[in-house]
């Protein structure tokens, strides 16, 4: 008989993406994917990123040509998906967009030239911010447990209005420090 082969384990990021995806699919979302090599139009212009925004600089973005780059966020998939949905008259839309992103960052404890991002997008009529909050709170509690607390803070993202960031209590210590 041959030598026993040790089977590897799934990477922690892959496990997390699978878990997040499963939670959102359970809430009626579908997965949207797109290319990692993108156009300036989809990565910046269509997302209302100002022409002078620092993220467009050569020092922050990996440009392949003047108009082609490695995506800096998964948001270009939103543009592609929304354009397709409008063309096909396929609304409302509920998607989750997991994927790799690239930025010209110096590696440290909080930065990496390649990182993973997951975005959530809902497009439809009569959708309220309260429904968004409820969706995100449901997600957080399913991921970290029912006792997890959330706090929504207003934030400015050029491509969403209104915008918010979400703080989550520590799943390990419950916020005790």
Q: Which sequence ranges carry the predicted segments?
A:
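Conserved oxyanion/phosphate-binding beta-strand-loop segments in alpha/beta enzyme cores
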Residues: 1
